[in-house]
Amino acid sequence: YARKSFFKYVDAENVFEVTKQGFAYFEKTFGLAYPFGKYDQIAVAEYNWGAMENVGCVTFHEDVLIFRSKVTERNYVSRATTIHHEMAHMWFGDLVTMKWWEDLWLNESFAEWASYQSVSESTKYKEAWTEFNSLRKNWAYRVDQLTTTHPIATEMEDLDAVRTNFDGISYAKGASVLQQLVAHVGRDNFIKGLRLYFAKHAYGNTTLKDLIDQLEAASGRDLTPWVSTWLRTAGVNTLRPVIAVDGDSYKSISIKQEAPTMPVGSKELRPHRLHVGLFDIQGEKLSRRTSVELDIAGALTEVTALAGQKVADLVLINDKDQTYAKLRFDDRSIATMKSHLGKLDDSLARGLIWASLWDSCRDGELSTSDYVAIALNALKTESDISIVAATYLQFETAIWAYANPAKRDALRTQVADATAAALANAAPGSDHQMQFARAFANNAITPAHLEKLKEILNGSEKGLVIDAEIRWYIFI
């Protein structure tokens, strides 16, 4: 449903396709048919939320559900995950509802996780987890390093406290930690536990213990230590490689784990089940040679399975993105990233590296100038539009919040010049062409840039649709 004046913009075919795919996925995965009879989706004018999971009637902000100008695939992925997020709430939140707000994560973290899982497995948007990593997980990292950080499962004294916890921790960190829980107990056991949970508590109210009891029953594992360290403590750990080389082979590779910087004084070192990947330059591409899975704990864990392996061009901790931690790299890997990041042939692995570059800049370990230079070079060959869009958002923050004010104009010029070149080389009518045009408009600063904007408005870029959206970018 939408306003009559918006009917011409409604992409009913895509919305209904994604909706049907979500229903089929959730009913099969959760082992329980949709419980509420009807299911309506309404685009609401000037809505004060992105969307809301009312039983049988989901309400969306118009701009979430309806596109009035041409958009990139990233917007379609975002819409699909929002549709599936609200649909997942029919089970997580409506069929089974938290008893009190300290278990907000039973609603939001699960809906966030379920939406990206379902979109990546049931729709054509197979790289949805890359979008999560590029945009949502970065949100979690930022919020989790502020003085206002809090545990995923945290006490809520009143409704004012509740309002402050609808944040990147309750949504994106929670979803990422659920990925770690899936790795910890195994996917089949995790899904079995969810089915037991829904069957036992349908139309009831629950606490964290109710869910954990069913996951323990399904997996045969005591999850008390896991809950204590992952759900009851705040902050994000950092994982670094410690590498010893013997000739052209690894004598040893170990993973050093550092405690969170926030909360101040935290000494929390968590257990992680993760993969470590080795990647090699093969012609123009950077490809995965091998990836080993292991459990790490404490300050230092050796990856014994990689001892004796030939030295790789890139070592990636948390390959396949099963855990929640900031990542760092050895010198050889950094050199490889500078030359071949955009040529790495796995989008999720690239997303992990892009995220690490960004939080290295945010943490002051990588200068703004170096971040911009590395990123602009990699963007030349970056194929995932979610990564491209996220990087340009991060350029804005880096230049306006982190850079030396005396260097801002030079950095904006550098970004605009590189983006103009990328725009000239982009395929006509492509998502990249549209994203580069918008980014160029945001960073244009010199007289030559302004002349280029006039040319764009007059149709100089073949295939670029000059609609209201791109005009706003140019004029504002």
Give the ranges of each region predicted by the language model.
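Hydrophobic alpha-helical and helix-loop surface patches within well-folded domains
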Residues: 1-258, 262-265, 397-398, 413-414, ...
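Non-catalytic accessory/interaction domains
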Residues: 2, 88, 152-155, 177, ...
